[in-house]
Amino acid sequence: MKRILSALLIGTVASLALSAAEVGKPAPDFTATDITGKTHRLSDYKGKIVVLESYNYGCPYVVYHYKSKAMQELQAELTEKGVIWLLVNSVHPGHSDYRTPEAARKEWDQLGIKATAWLHDTSGAVGKAYGMRTTPHMFVIDKDGVLVYQGAIDDRAATSGDPRKARNYVREVVNKLLAGEKPEVTQTKPYGCSVKYAD
């Protein structure tokens, strides 16, 4: 199992140079529908901090963060502070990890997800615009619509143990922004499984 997870990690971690969205520049705008049928545009959230999370519960790294409830706790903590948190699920319909909107809503309820919305990005348009390569792969956008962080959720690429003991980059970056300060960390290497795009 360890060997399989190591292969997943080594084979799917993206080079920062491959990211389509650049830290320090305006985040790519997008329009996407969530699993309830509501349309979301990034530009609608100007004036708010936005977190994008590349999500697929078929990945053991994602399971690790959600089974521990650490991800839901962070979502609740930050959304209560006015942060917008969007899950981006770019799994194409032909893959076994694909969720219909109905199945996604059940998964949302069963896991107790506390994000703002789950974007049903089956075309991969949002994921590719940001260069999302792994699940999870995190992005933080400031109130001016500028991408200020992209990379891993934390500094511990693991599937066991307590993620709360890791250094959580997303919490750190968002809290810096909320305090009116410049984040110290702006890019890290994301870890996890590959995003299941159609091509």
Q: Where on the chain are the PLM-derived regions?
A:
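Bacterial N-terminal signal peptides
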Residues: A7-A17
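Structural microenvironment flanking redox-active thiols in thiol-disulfide oxidoreductases
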Residues: V63-L111, T122-A129
